[in-house]
Regions:
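Alpha-helical cap/lid subdomain in secreted, periplasmic
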Residues: 1-123
Length: 123
């Protein structure tokens, strides 16, 4: 674990990347609801990972807030909009506060694919 020490978290990611010896990687952000109202901004740990890994980081929570429903052809509800204001992913994409359902994982896959295209890993 990283014991809520963000520098330790970054060091753990760096160790895995260095151990793999691969320059082609994507750091995928968490999809948990934030403990506090994050809105559509980054949480402290998301900002830390974004700063540490730059273009290799995808903020998956924000990706799903911004694109999840449209990726799946779902309509945005009033409840979705209220949740977004608190930084929460639509319940239409979730099994619970941390796990996604089939729609959520489908959209997550699209997000990772798009990030790989952006980084030139595939076309």
């Amino acid at each position: 674990g990283w014991d809520d020490d963000l520098s330790k978290l970054v060091a753990q990611y760096d160790a895995m990347i260095n151990s793999a010896g691969c320059k082609y990687y994507i750091i995928i952000g968490d999809t948990d609801d934030p403990y506090y109202d994050a809105g559509v901004g980054e949480t402290a740990w998301e900002a830390t990972l974004h700063e540490a890994f730059g273009e290799h980081f995808i903020n998956m929570r924000l990706y799903l807030i911004e694109h999840g429903l449209s990726d799946c052809g779902l309509e945005t509800t009033f409840a979705d909009m209220e949740g977004y204001c608190n930084g929460e992913i639509s319940k239409q994409l979730r099994a619970d506060w941390t796990h996604l359902n089939a729609y959520g994982y489908y959209s997550k896959g699209i997000g990772v694919y798009k990030k790989g295209v952006e980084l030139g890993y595939w076309s």
